[in-house]
Amino acid sequence: EDAQQQFSDALEQFTHLMNYDGGELQDVYEELKEQYEESNQAAAEVTKRINKVESVADALFDEWETELDKYTNPGLRRESASKLQDTQRRYQSLVKSMRKAEAKMSPVLSALQDNVLYLKHNLNATAIGALQSEFNGVKNDINQLIAEMNNAIKESNAFISSMRD
């Protein structure tokens, strides 16, 4: 994740440095990236909530089981124990459904992440293409500077020659 952030930062720095505008591709990428990050956070929150439900339910069931021994009336104890088993069965079914729904999030997030990466890499390819035109501009500037320097050298050589005469 740190590498992904670093890579993203590199593209951002390049964009600012080069005044590069990725146009619609960049807009779509940024929107999709934001949606992915929000979806990823929401999925993590769902997992946290399911874990909390399990933790609370475990504590409640432990307490219920412990308190069964406190009954003095065997009939009430049997009825409560039966209700405990029934409730645990229904709870297990509920948790199974929640975990099944949770498991379906991962492939969807993976597909969304793949799309985000694909758009990003296409954006990077386009940005690298922009580097070529920047390189050509720098190369022209360098050639012009070299020509001006050669001209200045010729002029200074001519001046030095005229001083010797």
Predicted regions and their residues:
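Amphipathic alpha-helical coiled-coil segments
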Residues: 3, 38-50, 86-104, 141-153
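A structural signal for long alpha-helical coiled-coils and helix-turn connectors
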Residues: 11, 15-18, 65-68, 72, ...
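Extended amphipathic alpha-helical interaction segments
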Residues: 49-129
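Long amphipathic all-alpha helical oligomerization modules
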Residues: 99-165
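N-terminal Sec/ER secretory leader and immediately downstream segment
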Residues: 1-48
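Short, charged, amphipathic alpha-helical segments
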Residues: 26-34, 77-85, 129-136
